Amino acid sequence: MSIITEIQGDLFDAPEGAALIHACNCQGSWGKGIAATFKEKYPAAYRIFRSHCQQYLSHPQTWTQTQTSRQQSRAFKLPEGTALIIPPQPADYQPQPQPQSQTAPLSNCGRGRGRGRGRAGGGALHNSRELTALSRPAGKKHWIICLFTSWHYGRWSRSPPDIILENTMSAMADLKRQIAAAAAASSTTSPATTTTTTTALAATGGCEEEQLGELWGCRLNAGLFEVPWERTKAVLEEAGLAVTIVQPPGSGYE
């Protein structure tokens, strides 16, 4: 029985506390495809993602892993082949003020004929300026998980499909490690068990009492990275984490 469950619907209707997984580039861009929707719905999470990428772009680091499929080592440029877990950000799920356009007052308002009417109009404009914000509706409290599967983006710059799949396998292994480390840390209060993973979660604004929920995702790599979904699905099944994959009806993107 497959541990990957595929359904039709809207990924962003995932239950409260769910972790939404999507494939990312390492340049700090959520510019197109479903990534643009992530950026719109979770702007605070996007800022954390972008800062994470810029850190490695400014101070490059590499790490080496032996690829069992090729029986040889390969150097990864961080954050390539890793996973970034971003806890729910209050600015993303709490109602937020939104800027509202204002009408500029007329330059001759209150001058010459009709001065009284000009004053009254000015008062109306003053009152309208006080209503400068509209509240954005509250969103769901979702975790965001970024799998860094391609170094760059764009048809001519993205990584080749085989490299994207290797990066996906590596990133899923990293995700499993982080989930296990966080679970171990939450089961004891000993400072000795604190891991770099939990420190990273705290640094991004997460609360230790927050628990990572179900894993939900889109058809990873199948959109702008143009990797056949069945190939990525096989990698996810090998990784061993149960994930619900949501595909919009009639849609063919990631």
Curated annotation (Swiss-Prot):
It is an enzyme of class 3 (hydrolase). The lineage of its organism: Eukaryota, Fungi, Dikarya, Ascomycota, Pezizomycotina. This is ADP-ribose 1''-phosphate phosphatase. It comes from Ajellomyces capsulatus (strain NAm1 / WU24). The keyword Hydrolase applies. GO terms for molecular function: phosphoprotein phosphatase activity. Its EC number is 3.1.3.84. Highly specific phosphatase involved in the metabolism of ADP-ribose 1''-phosphate (Appr1p) which is produced as a consequence of tRNA splicing. Belongs to the POA1 family. Substrate binds at residues 9-11, 23-25, 30-35, 220-226. Residues 91-102 have a biased composition (Low complexity). Keywords: Hydrolase, Protein phosphatase. It catalyses: ADP-alpha-D-ribose 1''-phosphate + H2O = ADP-D-ribose + phosphate. GO terms for biological process: peptidyl-glutamate ADP-deribosylation. Residues 86-125 are annotated as: Disordered. Residues 1-254 form the Macro domain.
